[in-house]
């Protein structure tokens, strides 16, 4: 809990704070525009809205560029623990808002229930992949981005095909409550995997630096 509170306090000192806040606001605005204009039937609205959580991760992880942080006892927490904890909590809050919106829309436009649950299911899937991507992208950005895009594009195509043939019987039968539980579970699991990957890469970087400082 202390790390979580400290992480949120540190956001105000994040790298390029104004730029990140502007981008976060832009992504949120784009998400709202897509959601409102499509009445929640367009996946892009929820997608942009949920990805604003990545900025919390980015603002903390970039603090490691500071020489002060590199020599601080807080280095590991700022590079591994806090970004994951803070961004995961942000994702949980954003997802709660998104689920509440979908619930309200289902009550207002019950004829679109199928579409709302399809888009929510796909957003959960994409967000899970994005969280894992964050765990490795700051170490292997280009490689992880290429793999992420290929995997997401392939899986999205497969998922779209599956939903097209099965969404009426499978996804609709889940209901908004079960989809919400699935989403929360995916975010928490994504956070755990993200933490483990970040921790593994941190040890790898530390080992590499030690080896380079003691040449044979």
What does each model-found stretch correspond to?
Residues 76-77:
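Alpha-helix N-cap/start motif
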Residues 210-216:
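Single conserved hydrophobic/aromatic residue that forms the stacking wall/gate
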Residues 1-66, 81-209:
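Hydrophobic alpha-helical transmembrane segments of membrane proteins
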């Amino acid at each position: 809990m202390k790390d979580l509170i400290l992480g949120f306090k540190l956001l105000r000192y994040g790298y390029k704070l104004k730029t990140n806040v502007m981008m976060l606001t832009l992504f949120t605005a784009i998400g709202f525009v897509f959601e409102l204009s499509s009445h929640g039937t367009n996946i892009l609205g929820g997608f942009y809205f949920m990805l604003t959580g990545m900025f919390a991760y980015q603002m903390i992880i970039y603090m490691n560029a500071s020489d002060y942080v590199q020599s601080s006892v807080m280095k590991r927490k700022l590079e591994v623990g806090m970004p994951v904890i803070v961004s995961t909590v942000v994702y949980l809050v954003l997802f709660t808002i998104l689920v509440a919106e979908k619930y309200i829309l289902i009550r207002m436009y019950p004829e679109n229930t199928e579409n709302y649950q399809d888009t929510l299911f796909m957003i959960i899937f994409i967000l899970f992949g994005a969280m894992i991507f964050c765990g490795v992208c700051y170490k292997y950005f280009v490689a992880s981005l290429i793999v992420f895009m290929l995997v997401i594009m392939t899986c999205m195509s497969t998922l779209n095909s599956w939903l097209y043939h099965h969404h009426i019987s499978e996804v609709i039968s889940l209901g908004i409550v079960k989809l919400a539980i699935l989403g929360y579970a995916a975010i928490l699991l994504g956070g755990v995997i993200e933490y483990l990957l970040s921790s593994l890469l941190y040890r790898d970087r530390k080992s590499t630096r030690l080896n380079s400082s003691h040449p044979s």
